[in-house]
Amino acid sequence: MDSFTIQKSTKILKNLDAKIEDYTIINQRNDSLKVDTSLTIEKFYKLNYLRSDNFELIEFSNTGHTYNSLSFVESKGLFPQIGSNAKHYNYLKTNDINYYHVATPFTELMYRSAFVQGQLLDALFSVNTSPRFNFTIARKGLRSLGNYQHFLSSSSNFRFSTNYNSRNSKYFLKTHYVNQNLFSEENGGIREDDISNFESGNTEFIDRSVFDPQFENADNTLHGKRFYLNQNYLIKNSLDSLNTRKWSVGNIITLENKYYQFKQSTSNEYFGESTGFNQINDKVSFDTFLVNFNTSFSSSKLGMTTFFMNYRDVNYNYESIIDENFSFGLNYLFKKENYILDFQFESMLTGDVEGSLIKAGLLLNINSDSNIKFEKNTQRFKCTNSH
């Protein structure tokens, strides 16, 4: 009997305490994690702007700006992205959104101060209106003035997610909406004649705001909105003592719009001489629409195999548009206690893009705190036409 058990009189059973096992976080791969309320060193390392261990990242002088990465993670796909990767460290992608199943209303708050009149707050509220339906609303907000002139950063990550499963446990739905705005002022760094004072250690220059920057009239913004829907229907579910076999069909719809914009009221020769214009206002948009149809076969002995067909429409909103691309492929996932094996293949069928993508990975769990991952990516890509 769990914390959702209800008497026939529709009254909730009294003196039935919710257990920590009744609070579950579900990721995009349907892996379930129990909510962890313990206070550990690992949790301390995640008490930051990215809400993750940033051991391999060197933060800039103000929270909310970019990072210098000391590691290299190769990421390949069949389609080029918008670029502006330096602004994407805090941009929540589809795989970053979690779903919840909770026995009672659940709240999580994270607060820490930032640089000079700076505050960072991440708030999440989740509730199950019934054992089968949950909705979660969350927002992370930052505003940090920074130690240097004209280096303010401000960001907002709003997300709303729901998940539902039918009474007969055959239909499953996950959906989310996110709205993100990442803004930062740019100053080009301090001037060359201030470098000696910066490095001197003189107490007169401990206050970094005394240094004059290269310019004080530039800023950039990354803004994005995404709607995501993932639904599955379980056609067959065979259970026995030795093997569990399932067959399901599914559909995924993703609609995302994002843009990156850099503005400077008057151009500056620090980056080189500009010709033909005095004011800079560069903006590029990136719209994507994805429809996925898939069918999955899973077995506790053989793992899960998924065959899929994708339709993509990608619009860069300037001279080049890539549209009406169809692709097909398969995913394979096999999990055991000590390792996880995954394989992905996707190839284009029609459209302006020709190519294929192969990914293979092996994750070895050494112990509860350590793991090793091996991954190999192979990509073939060619754009045959642009208009």
Model-derived features: positions:
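Solvent-exposed loop/turn segments connecting transmembrane beta-strands
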Residues: 86-87, 111-120, 145-153, 317-326, ...
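Short loop/turn motifs that connect adjacent beta-strands in outer-membrane beta-barrel proteins
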Residues: 97-104, 131-132, 167-173, 236-247, ...
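Transmembrane beta-strand segments that form the barrel wall of outer-membrane beta-barrel proteins
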Residues: 104-113, 135-147, 309-315, 337-351, ...
